[in-house]
Structure formats: C-alpha cells, structure tokens
Curated annotation (Swiss-Prot):
Species this chain originates from: Buchnera aphidicola subsp. Acyrthosiphon pisum (strain Tuc7)
Subunit: Homodimer.
Recorded superkingdom: Bacteria
EC number of the protein: 2.4.2.18
First-level EC class: transferase
Gene that encodes it: trpD
Residues reported in the UniProt entry to bind Mg(2+) 2: 223-224
Keywords (A to Z) from UniProt: Amino-acid biosynthesis, Aromatic amino acid biosynthesis, Glycosyltransferase, Magnesium, Metal-binding, Transferase, Tryptophan biosynthesis
Positions with a binding annotation for anthranilate 2: 165
Protein name: Anthranilate phosphoribosyltransferase
GO cellular component: cytosol
C-alpha cells in the first residue's frame, strides 16, 4: 500500500491492478478520511488514467450485491450527469420508451448529482419502487422488459467515501464510475458524457470491461443527443472503436433552434414527462427522447437511425409508454406490499 501511495503523491499513474487494490481498500472502509482526501485530490490534479478508472470500477463491481443476471441480451442507458443543465431525465424516459419497443433494459439509477431531479427522484414520482428485491426486479424485466437497480441498494462500498467527497466539493474519480457500475453487468450500453474530452476515456473503459457493443456520446455540453447541433459519438463493436458525428438530419429530423429547456423543480419535471409519455408533449421533447432511443436501438443491432426514430416517436405519440410505466409501477408495488406484510 505504501508504494501505491508514493506513486500517487509523486504524480505517477497506477496500473490497473494497483488501482484495484487501492479501491478495494477504499470500498472496505480501510482508508482513513484524511488519507482518502489526499489520494483523491492528488489523482484529480494530475488526472486519472483509463487503467486507474478501470481498476476502481472492477473493485466496486467485485463488492456489489447479487443480482440474477439474465441469459438474454440487455442494455443500460445512462448519463454521467454533471452538466448542470437541469433538463428533463432523457435517459430514464428513453429507457421506458425502449422497453415499450420490446428492448430489455436494466437501468442503473442514482440520486441527483447536479440536476433538480435525478433518475431515482423522478422514478419515485411515478411510484416505481426502487427497493424491490433483486428477484422481483428480474421478474419485472422478464415480463415488462425493464427494471431499475438503485445504486445505494447494491453498492455498500460508497458509504465509506461519502463524507470526504462531500467535503471536497469537487469532481473526483468517483463522479465517473457510476455509468460502469450496473450490478447486472450488461453486455450493451449507451453512455452520455458531460464533456467531449471524456468520450475516448469512456469508450476505452467499456472496451477494458469487455462490453459486447456500446455507444458513448456527447453534444453541446450535455450527456445526450441534441437536435440543435452536432452529436459526437464513439462506438465499440467487436473490440473495435469507431468515431463519427451525427446531425438531426441523421435521424430524419430537422434542426431545432437552440432552446433553454431547464426545469425548475421535481414537480415540473414530473408534469412535463407525464404529458410526453401520454403522447401529449411538445414536438421538441418527443423528438429529443426519440433520437436517444434511436441510439439505444442501434446497440441492439437496429442500424437505421431514421427508422429507429420513427419507431420511438410512434410509441411516444401513442400514449403506450405511460401505460407501460403504470404497469411497471403496479408490478413493483405488489412487492412493496408483500414486504410490509411479512
């Protein structure tokens, strides 16, 4: 351990195994707060390497609680957050639309970081029980194509660093781990990053973690596809990485003028999303969700982005997505009821 610390303090990079050892200790509560603060600060100042981040991810994955992973193909869709845009929860709603289209989605979700409402906050507004048992979550996935795994329920190891991270009041390596810590370890994923410079880092981490196919994207300082400019993409397929750019026309849509789509509260976010999922939302919001669903369909092998977008728009405008959300909530509510009666 001493050699690992000396390397960090000398601004030298750890290899993947050294990082794994370090974060295994951190996730076990065996590093003091003052030492942890110095480690995180030193790593942040010199920048964290792909190998260091991969080692940290593997350490936390090895300590997570069990989830009954399915044999069939499934995906996650997640954003890093941290863009401070306070927009609606695009990835969460895209997951529901994708499930309504027939895709299997296991969404890893957490509490808000920099937005007015994180994925868990909005899910609770829709009465989605985030404390469902792993078995019930798996059953919901089998029958309704989607389930949500709440990070604090599956990852105990983060509790040992919470106080230090709060006190530091700055982004650290921890802020980048979430999208890679899905307890179901999916073979597919779509990840949005808040900074264009993070695309290459994220896609190479996915390669290190042996994802079958994945997309990392960024557009206009947000962690999602936008409709007023260029979306930058790196795609992992068969251990090879390709990079390309997309425009709204790539999805068969027209360019929208740039608009501020900020929401001011959880209640406002919920109301906007509810109307969209009922098929009564604004055209801009419908299309914004649809293009992100199109990318999710792509990792499942549906290569035509224009057709993918049409399919997603049809599902959104039909109102079927809201019915699907209600069905998921009702199924998980049964589990909640059973727990209260045991």
């Amino acid at each position: 351990m001493r050699n690992i610390l000396l390397k960090i303090y000398d601004s030298k990079f750890l290899n993947q195994e050294e990082s794994y050892q370090l974060f295994t200790l951190i996730s076990s509560g065996k590093i003091t707060d003052i030492k942890l603060a110095s480690i995180l600060t030193a790593m942040k100042i010199r920048g964290e390497s792909i190998e260091e981040i991969t080692g940290a991810i593997k350490a936390f994955l090895d300590k997570m609680k069990y989830f009954p992973k399915p044999d069939y193909i499934f995906s996650d869709i997640v954003g890093t957050g941290g863009d401070a845009k306070n927009t609606i929860n695009i990835s969460t709603m895209s997951a529901f639309v994708a499930a309504t289209c027939g895709l299997k989605i296991i969404k890893h979700c957490n509490q808000r970081i920099s937005s007015k409402s994180g994925s868990s906050d909005i899910l609770e507004k829709f009465n989605i029980n985030l404390n469902a048992s792993p078995e019930k979550s798996r059953k919901t996935l089998d029958q309704l194509n989607i389930c949500f795994l709440f990070a604090p329920k599956y990852h105990d190891g983060f509790k040992y660093s919470n106080n230090v991270r709060t006190d530091l009041k700055t982004k650290t390596i921890f802020n980048f781990l979430g999208p890679f810590l899905n307890p179901a370890t999916p073979p597919l994923s779509v990840i949005g990053v808040y900074n264009k410079n993070l695309i290459n880092i994220a896609v190479n981490i996915l390669k290190n973690l042996q994802y079958k196919r994945a997309i990392v994207l960024h557009s206009d300082n947000t962690d999602e596809v936008t409709l007023h400019g260029t979306t930058y993409v790196s795609e992992l397929l068969n251990k090879k990485i390709i990079s390309y750019q997309l425009q709204p026309e790539s999805f068969g849509l027209k360019m929208h003028p740039k608009k501020i789509l900020k929401i001011n509260s959880l209640e406002e976010n919920y109301h906007i999303i509810k109307e969209i999922m009922k098929g009564k939302g604004s055209k801009l919001y419908e299309e914004l969700i649809a293009v992100n669903v199109a990318m999710l369909l792509k990792v499942f092998g549906y290569e035509n982005l224009k057709e993918n977008t049409k399919l997603a728009l049809n599902k959104i405008r039909s109102g079927d997505v809201y019915k699907h959300i209600r069905n998921v909530a009702n199924m998980l509510k049964e589990d909640n009821h059973a727990r209260h009666n045991t």
